């Protein structure tokens, strides 16, 4: 008989289910287990088609209306539960069929202890779904979301009884009890130590004493291993084995019976032979009242197939998890003797219709910005999303309003439309903490656009899209670097219409400071519009206002890819190419402002540097990443920008001239980055090859991201 509680339920449950110690050790060391324990999605299951446009949001707060009152529902768990829920189903569903949902019929009889949240008392789990029972027993409050079994909300069993030998004794009256204490004594938690605070809340005073006539307690003290430190499995195994070897004589003295290793292996082999292969046929959906919504979910999982394999279900499961309309899905399956397949029971929690996002960027540079987003979602046979957001700050401000409709047809597709108002003030972003920007550019860009887009998925990580946009941009700038208070800026207005078709592929693990996956795109745009230039006081005298029509094609291609050579070292490669037949605008600076730019690092997005803008260019570089910890790394990045037919301010009237390829410009970044779970915390030194200030120091928390432009 095996009895476990808290994290120990994973080990005890897997052993009882027919997993050998070597198999469990390999499992705990695997990449899959890392993803299960952190809630992050593996690259192979990141479904890009459903991803919304990127924003600098930190946390999502759901809003619910109850009793005519609005109620804010902040996140209740740090680690998303979908990975863990699917893992337990994948590992233990066939075991349930083999033991017929009776834990006494496992390879070794087993039960575990959870905590009933509402009754604050132990819940003994001896039958039912083994994966759900283990999931309940190890659900540490605040880290994982509680699980409901038979109408009872359950948490970590260690909350009320972290060493349930008394339950074992009263219920089963065993001849000998062998216990293993791995819980360290409580340490005083610091005010800012959330992990320590949670550990102390969970670890209540526990009686670990067993009468010497009734059994033995092994004790392993883990000085440097804390709650959920799964990455330290090697140390845990080493220390645990050492404790067992030191106690083996005492254990042998208590137990006279001997079983050979071969006998245990044969018993495990016979039990595992009872496990049917995982194929799924019937699907039931719980938690969704609307029949059209249930049909939407079932069709997303099965499509037109009658039976699906585990691999097919896993891929479609994570596609649904990526759907903004669904908050969580807990998969439970039961073996159907009549069909020979498993029936899927999906406990679905729809996303609340109303959601508020909070985020932005806080830094030592005056690019601080706040962000608030609002989403309203609903779905039946189709999925509907209404989205708006607002950015506010000295450097960048914006407002966006739009909607998206998803059609779950055989080839899914979406239609979306957005109206956006953008404003950048590059002069306001130019002051520095350590390196003075002696000649900051006075550039203010106001841009508004209305975009319509449609697209469909191309495999898991890609989508094909096409769209149109109406855009109006107004750039204000000076023609010289030295200006007087009375000077008036030049103003260039460009009213345009554009069409685009493109392919995007994205499997990156983070929206900024990524270290895994790839991002690629190629797009072709046709842009037509009217440029109006109104000279200011720094233009050459007698410069008239001008109107010019522009019609041109713009081809853009980009690739970023990371190669994980070891657990410590990753190499990233980035390349970008832009080609167009766009004519120059009325003067040098307006030409640069209307040209595409190269922004390979977050900080580069906050500056306007003329050297890195051109109508045609090639650019690329490398990114070396040294992982100090899974979420903490050192990054060294270097890039080169090669303009083609570069505009140069060589003529007296500031009109551009061209050279095919003559110059190249360098930029780079050295940074320490820690991914906190809500946003990146970074300390960086940035270099740009340009006149005057070339080094920029930045301490930043959050994201430097903007709403999209029209072209």
Walk through the language-model features, giving the residues of each.
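Flexible glycine-/small-residue-rich
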Residues: 114-117, 220, 285-289, 348-352, ...
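Short, glycine/acidic-rich beta->alpha junctions
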Residues: 157-161, 198-199, 394-395, 446, ...
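Short glycine-rich, acidic/polar surface loops and turns
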Residues: 164-165, 197-211, 621-623, 657-659, ...
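Gram-negative/organellar outer-membrane beta-barrel architecture
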Residues: 311-312, 316, 322, 328-508, ...
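Extended beta-strand-rich architecture
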Residues: 498-504, 508, 515-653, 659-670
């Amino acid at each position: 008989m095996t009895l476990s509680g808290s994290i120990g339920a994973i080990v005890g449950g897997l052993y009882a289910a027919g997993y050998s110690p070597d198999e469990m050790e390999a499992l705990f060391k695997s990449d899959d287990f890392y993803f299960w324990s952190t809630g992050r999605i593996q690259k192979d299951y990141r479904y890009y088609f459903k991803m919304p446009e990127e924003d600098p949001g930190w946390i999502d707060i759901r809003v619910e209306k109850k009793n005519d009152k609005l109620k804010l529902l902040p996140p209740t768990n740090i680690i998303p539960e979908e990975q863990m829920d699917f893992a337990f189903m994948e590992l233990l569903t066939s075991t349930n069929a083999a033991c017929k949902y009776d834990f006494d019929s496992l390879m070794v009889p087993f039960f575990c202890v959870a905590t009933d949240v509402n009754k604050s008392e132990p819940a003994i789990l001896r039958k039912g779904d083994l994966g759900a029972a283990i999931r309940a027993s190890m659900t540490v409050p605040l880290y994982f979301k509680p699980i409901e079994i038979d109408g009872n909300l359950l948490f970590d069993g260690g909350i009320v009884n972290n060493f349930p030998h008394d339950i074992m004794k009263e219920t089963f009256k065993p001849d000998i009890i062998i216990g293993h204490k791995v819980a360290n004594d409580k340490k005083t938690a610091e005010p800012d130590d959330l992990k320590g605070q949670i550990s102390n809340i969970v670890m209540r005073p526990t009686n670990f004493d067993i009468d010497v006539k009734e059994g033995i307690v092994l004790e392993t003290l883990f000085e440097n291993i804390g709650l959920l430190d799964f990455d330290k499995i090697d140390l845990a195994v080493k220390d645990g084995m050492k404790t067992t070897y030191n106690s083996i004589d005492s254990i042998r003295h208590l137990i006279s019976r001997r079983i050979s290793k071969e006998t245990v292996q044969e018993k495990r082999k016979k039990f595992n032979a009872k496990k049917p292969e995982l194929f799924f046929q019937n699907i039931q959906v719980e938690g969704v009242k609307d029949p059209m919504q249930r049909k939407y979910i079932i069709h997303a999982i099965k499509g037109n197939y009658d039976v699906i394999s585990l691999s097919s279900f896993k891929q479609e499961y994570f596609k649904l998890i990526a759907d903004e309309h669904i908050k969580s899905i807990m998969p439970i399956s039961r073996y159907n003797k009549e069909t020979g397949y498993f029936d899927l029971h999906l406990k679905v929690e729809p996303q609340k219709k109303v959601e508020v996002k909070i985020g932005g960027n806080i830094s030592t540079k005056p690019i601080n910005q706040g962000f608030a987003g609002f989403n309203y979602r609903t779905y039946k046979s189709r999925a509907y999303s209404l989205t708006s957001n607002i950015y506010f700050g000295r450097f960048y401000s914006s407002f966006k309003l739009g909607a998206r409709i998803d059609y779950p047809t055989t080839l899914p597709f979406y239609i979306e439309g957005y109206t956006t108002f953008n404003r950048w003030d590059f002069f306001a972003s130019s002051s520095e903490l350590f390196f003075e920007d002696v000649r900051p550019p006075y550039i203010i860009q106001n841009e508004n656009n209305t975009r319509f887009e449609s697209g469909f998925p191309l495999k898991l990580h890609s989508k094909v899209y096409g769209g149109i946009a109406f855009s109006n941009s107004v750039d204000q700038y000076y023609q010289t670097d030295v200006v007087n208070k009375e000077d008036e800026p030049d103003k260039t207005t460009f009213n345009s219409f554009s069409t685009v078709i493109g392919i995007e592929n994205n499997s990156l693990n983070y929206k900024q400071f990524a270290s895994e996956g790839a991002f690629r795109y190629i797009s072709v745009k046709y842009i037509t519009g009217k440029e109006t230039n109104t000279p200011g006081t720094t233009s050459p005298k007698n410069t008239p206002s001008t109107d010019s029509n522009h019609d041109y094609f713009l081809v853009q291609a980009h690739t970023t890819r990371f190669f994980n050579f070891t657990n410590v070292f990753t190499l990233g490669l980035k390349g970008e190419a832009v080609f167009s037949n766009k004519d120059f605008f009325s003067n040098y600076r307006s030409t640069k402002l209307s040209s595409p730019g190269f922004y390979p690092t977050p900080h580069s997005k906050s500056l306007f540097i003329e050297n890195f803008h051109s109508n045609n260019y090639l650019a690329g570089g490398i990114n070396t990443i040294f992982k100090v910890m899974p979420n903490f790394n050192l990054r060294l990045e270097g890039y080169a920008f090669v303009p083609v037919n570069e505009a140069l301010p060589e003529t007296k009237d500031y009109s551009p001239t061209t050279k095919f390829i003559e110059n190249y410009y360098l930029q780079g970044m050295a940074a320490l980055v820690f991914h906190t779970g809500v946003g990146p915390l970074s300390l960086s030194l940035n270099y740009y090859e340009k006149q005057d200030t070339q080094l920029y120091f930045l301490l930043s928390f959050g994201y430097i991201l903007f709403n999209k432009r029209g072209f």
